[in-house]
Every structure is written in C-alpha cells, then in structure tokens.
C-alpha cells in the first residue's frame, strides 16, 4: 500500500503580509496622533491680526483693538479726533467750518490749525475731511499712558486710560505667543527668556498676555513665573 503524505501549508508569506499591514496601520495611527498633538508652526499674519494696511496705525484702548485706525505721517502717529473725543479726552473740538482745532483749558482756550507745529511736526492732519491729532498733543492734555510701535511695518499704539494695578509675570524660558489658547493656534512671536509680560487674563492652562514689544496673545501658564501686582503711578 502506498502511504499518502499531506502537504504542509506555509504560513510565512501570510504572516509577513499581516505584519506589514499592522506596521502600516501603526505608522498611520502614529502620524495622525502626532499631527494632533504636535504644536502648530504657522506664523500669524500680523497685518490681518491688527486689521491694518499701508500707513494705518492700529489703536488698542486698554488692550482692546479698536475699529478706528490712526495714521502715520511725518514720523508721527496721529489719531482721529472723533475717537479721541469719545474715549480719551472730550475737550478737543474740531470746527469743521473753520478747519480749526479748539481746546478749552481752565483759564484759556487754545486754537490750532494745520499750519501749527509741535516739537516733532504738525499738531494735526486733515485727511479726506477727517481730522487727526498728533499723539504728542493728545498726551500733553490727557491723563493717559501710551506705548507706540511705529518703527515696524505693523504700526500700533496702546492707549491706557485705566490706573490702579496690573499683574505681571516673567517668562520662565524661551516661549511662543499664540493667537489663541492652544498649541495648534498660529504663532504671533517668540518670547525671550526672562522677559516681562502683563497678564490680562488667566485660564487653566493658558494666559492672555501683553508683551513688551507690543503684542497681545496667549502663552502656556507653565512658561510663566514670578507673578506680581504692580501699582501704576501718575507722572
């Protein structure tokens, strides 16, 4: 009688295919997870962030971006007198008929037109029927603090009318300032180690801050240290 032998099936190629599929699936899952948790590297469009173009100057009143825009001419920042009247100092009056600026002091009334010059240039500008006052003139007659950044392409000015105290913190080490509170949010700028920021709002993991170089955004709380309250003093 002839003996019959069963042929053994080889599972090697099948196992190799399964292993390869598992490897591909693992790599794909790792890629998806990596993309989900990897910090975003996109840079924010700063002009879009401040809603400005050309020679426009963004105005931030008490750290809030305003719809109104200033202008930059003759090496100076000029702000719309209508906006100044509403939010900073109502004593400035623009006589549209006479094209004359009127300001009432306790003991006298001061007048100025486009020909009047200050230490750095014209005290006012009229553009497309709209009057603008120089930032220097506004500062001379108003109880405010200002910080302007007019040497960069993204021109902006911070006007603060609120006094009292502010919370500050020190950046623990080199960090990233983002548009929103999340690692995927676009990058505004880098924060250098030991730089000081003003803390505007604190959340669980992120804080909204204002930087020394004139940006407002979000930084992770673990990047901040030495928080303190500082009193603002009228000069």
PLM region descriptions:
Residues 2-199, 203, 223-232:
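Primary recognition of N-terminal secretory signal peptides and signal-anchoring hydrophobic helices
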Residues 213-223:
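A short macromolecule-binding patch
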Residues 202, 211-212:
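Short glycine/proline-enriched turns and hinge-like loops at secondary-structure junctions
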Residues 194, 207-211:
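SH3/SH3-like beta-barrel fold
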């Amino acid at each position: 009688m002839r003996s019959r032998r069963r042929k053994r099936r080889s599972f090697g190629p099948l196992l190799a295919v399964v292993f390869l599929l598992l490897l591909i699936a693992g790599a794909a899952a790792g890629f998806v997870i990596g993309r989900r948790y990897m910090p975003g590297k996109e840079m924010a469009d700063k002009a879009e962030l401040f809603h400005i173009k050309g020679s426009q100057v963004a105005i931030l009143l008490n750290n809030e971006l305003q719809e109104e825009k200033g202008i930059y001419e003759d090496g100076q920042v000029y702000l719309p007198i209508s906006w100044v009247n509403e939010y900073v100092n109502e004593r400035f009056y623009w006589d549209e008929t006479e094209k004359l600026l009127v300001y009432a002091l306790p003991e006298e009334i001061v007048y100025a037109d486009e020909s009047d010059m200050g230490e750095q240039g014209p005290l006012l500008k009229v553009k497309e029927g709209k009057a603008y006052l120089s930032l220097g003139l506004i500062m001379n007659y108003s109880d405010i603090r200002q910080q302007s950044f007019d040497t960069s392409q993204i021109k902006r000015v911070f006007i603060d009318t609120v006094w009292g105290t502010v919370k500050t913190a020190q950046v623990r080490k080199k960090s990233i300032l983002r548009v929103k509170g999340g690692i995927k949010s676009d990058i505004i700028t880098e924060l250098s180690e030991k730089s000081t920021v003003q803390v505007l709002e604190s959340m669980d993991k992120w804080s909204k801050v204002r930087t020394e170089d004139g940006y407002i955004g979000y930084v992770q709380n673990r990047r901040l240290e030495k928080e303190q309250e500082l009193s603002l003093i009228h000069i």
